């Protein structure tokens, strides 16, 4: 679903580590032995789609009646991440680990280079967000870069120039590599940056695994029968990003909101962004044989798959799109409520990203709902106008 701009440079790692990468392996191994790593938390061996049904079956009736199967499965991940953050808050102040001085020097140089490379990738492919990260503390800024690069590399597996060669086994290997870096065994420089990040912040592995699950879906699934199915897909490929990054961005010390509610807002932003991607890219996706719209809602609107492939804007299509855009805006509204509860230095990049993405919906409307042959975008002038307003709003958020 994401754009497949060339990111081949992210895939230049040699089949076998060499040079500085060998030293990275050695230092990580030594740190792992000396420190003891936080164990990787895995919810269960049940696949997320199976877990969805299981969660509803075992949940109290009151909860099950409020949430769909997909929402319940995602809610479990939100609770897990919130618990990790609260646990880390209680542990804070225990003291930093110590290791040999010569290792610390080597490690600092190598890791500095790894984070620098992540920053370069973020600056090239996410310019506005990169600008916003400059307001964060150096440690948070670098951690967000590392997470961004991992997400981009994962997306490139199924949406990049080599996507036709990707198999389920390749994604299994990528997931094993993820587990290794969470255990302190990075494969390359980019992995090293993320491995260091997850050792410093209370980041759960499950959202990362779930994003890979979304890539698996893209290998075989090109239709979504209902919004419940689509919601789960949106969580996998975009909602997960919010759960990955909030532990890094931090929650404001004076926030009265529950940790869970802040994570729900982050999840809503990811869902809103992906729904916006879907509505913007209807024509592009249809030319690839894909329809990321709820088929049952299409049918209720008197539309068919053939109408999508035909690509003609009709009154039925306009009415249908108005409903889809409204839903995306509701998710953006829910997400915006959580921005005020983020750490003050993290609010601006999040709010700016939210406002700019939400304006894509305005652009679809301005194009008379023609998302078949016209690509909705926010022009540079509007972006420049939005950024200072978002900054001012973030500064006074409380």
Curated annotation (Swiss-Prot):
Principal localisation: plastid
Listed transmembrane segments: none
Keyword Transcription assigned: no
Membrane topology: Peripheral membrane protein
Cell compartments where the protein resides: Plastid, Chloroplast membrane; Plastid, Chloroplast, Plastoglobule
Annotated catalysed reactions: 2 (2E,6E,10E)-geranylgeranyl diphosphate = 15-cis-phytoene + 2 diphosphate
Sorted UniProt keywords: Carotenoid biosynthesis, Chloroplast, Isoprene biosynthesis, Membrane, Plastid, Transferase, Transit peptide
Gene3D superfamilies: Farnesyl Diphosphate Synthase (1.10.600.10)
EC number per UniProt: 2.5.1.32
Cross-referenced CDD domains: Trans_IPPS_HH
GO molecular function: 15-cis-phytoene synthase activity; geranylgeranyl diphosphate synthase activity; squalene synthase [NAD(P)H] activity
Induction per the UniProt record: Induced by salt stress and abscisic acid (ABA) in roots.
Presequence extent in this chain: 1-80
InterPro entries, per the entry: Isoprenoid_synthase_dom_sf, Squ/phyt_synthse, Squalene/phytoene_synthase_CS, Trans_IPPS_bact-type, Trans_IPPS_HH
Top EC class for this record: transferase
Any one of the GO CC terms: chloroplast membrane
Tissue specificity note: Expressed in leaves and endosperm. Expressed in developing leaves.
An example Gene Ontology biological process: carotenoid biosynthetic process
Similarity comment: Belongs to the phytoene/squalene synthase family.
PANTHER family tied to this protein: BIFUNCTIONAL LYCOPENE CYCLASE/PHYTOENE SYNTHASE
Its biological purpose: Catalyzes the conversion of geranylgeranyl diphosphate to phytoene. Mediates the first committed step in carotenoid biosynthesis.
The protein, known as: Phytoene synthase 2, chloroplastic
């Amino acid at each position: 679903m994401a754009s497949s701009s060339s990111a081949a440079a992210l895939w230049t790692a040699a089949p076998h580590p060499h040079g500085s990468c060998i030293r990275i392996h050695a230092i990580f191994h030594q740190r792992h032995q000396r420190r003891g790593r936080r164990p990787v938390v895995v919810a269960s061996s049940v696949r997320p789609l199976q877990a969805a049904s299981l969660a509803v079956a075992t949940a109290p009736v009151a909860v099950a009646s409020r949430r769909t199967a997909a929402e319940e499965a995602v809610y479990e991940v939100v609770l897990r991440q919130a618990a990790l953050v609260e646990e880390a808050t209680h542990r804070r102040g225990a003291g930093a680990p110590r290791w040999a001085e010569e290792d610390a020097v080597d490690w600092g140089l190598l890791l500095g280079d790894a984070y620098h490379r992540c920053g370069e990738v973020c600056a090239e492919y996410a310019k506005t967000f990169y600008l916003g990260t400059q307001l964060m503390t150096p440690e948070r800024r670098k951690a967000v870069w590392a997470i961004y690069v991992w997400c981009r590399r994962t997306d490139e597996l199924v949406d990049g120039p080599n996507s036709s060669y990707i198999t389920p086994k390749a994604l299994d290997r990528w997931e094993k590599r993820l587990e290794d870096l969470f255990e302190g065994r990075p494969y390359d420089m980019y992995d090293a940056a993320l491995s260091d990040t997850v050792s410093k912040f209370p980041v759960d592995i499950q959202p990362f695994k779930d994003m890979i699950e979304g890539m698996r879906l893209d290998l075989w699934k090109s239709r979504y029968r209902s919004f419940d199915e689509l919601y789960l897909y949106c969580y996998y490929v975009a909602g997960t990003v919010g759960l990955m990054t909030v532990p890094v961005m931090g929650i404001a010390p004076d926030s009265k909101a529950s940790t869970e509610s802040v994570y729900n807002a982050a999840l809503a932003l990811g869902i809103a962004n992906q729904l916006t991607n879907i509505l913007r890219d209807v024509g592009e996706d249809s030319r690839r044989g894909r329809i990321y719209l709820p088929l049952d809602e299409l049918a209720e609107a008197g539309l068919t798959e053939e109408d999508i492939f035909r690509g003609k804007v009709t009154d039925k299509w306009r009415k249908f799109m108005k409903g889809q855009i409204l839903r995306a805006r509701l998710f953006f509204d829910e997400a915006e409520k959580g921005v005020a509860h983020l750490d003050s230095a993290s609010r601006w990049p999040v709010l700016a990203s939210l406002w700019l993405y939400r304006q894509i919906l305005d652009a679809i409307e301005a194009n008379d709902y023609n998302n078949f042959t016209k690509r909705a975008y926010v022009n540079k002038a509007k972006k420049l106008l939005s950024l200072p307003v978002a900054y001012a709003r973030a500064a006074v958020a409380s």
